[in-house]
């Protein structure tokens, strides 16, 4: 590198450090996994030198699981900030639509299937000034877990919001893989959280257990799901650690704070001058086995010896 190039980089870095960057964060709903993504995103940026209160200002807005509110927030943010971080698929879709004309980058996280959400192409290329991280569930690992804990089970119930693209893609994968493990998937769609009690009354008598997707509406109303499932004596398998902490029996899930940190590091690359369009979206490949001993005991379930070594007791966390 010649001296003039080095001088340019040093001057650019100094200018970036002196500039206060404004980032809007749209969180689609308020629940543990998305909260952890937000915390991790801010931590990941801080690790890269973009520190809240020093050279970054964050405006965090929650859409309360409402796609219309997501769009309104995104429209406002696109006109006033340097970057938008969108947490969950509906927020990411709204942010991309709003920011496209404004020319500001969108960094998303907790998007289960960026391709089906049209946030990435089938070839992995981004459709515009957008990139981020996917929280694609380890579906096969979850099916193996359910089979290990419930060797006689044949039918798994899945609740999903019909307007959430992320749920559609994961549900399709469950239906594709379930027969390999001797399961049939029975699903029930809802429009809003208010639909859950009736949907559960229809679904639970037909199944041996239920497993959650990263469906924002269902997860936001997890207490309703757990209460109804207890009435019917049907265990609920979660899709991440927070759900297990709150009463699901177990989960093969990713670590959402780390997913957020990974997203923050990607955002730092964009803030340093890389184009979001040129950065392929990323995933986390590691899954962790989380168990809730009290919930397992309530349903008479035990973790087999071959899984116990890697099982993480959420009560000890």
Where are these regions (language model features)?
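Gram-positive cell-envelope targeting signals
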Residues: 6-7, 16-17
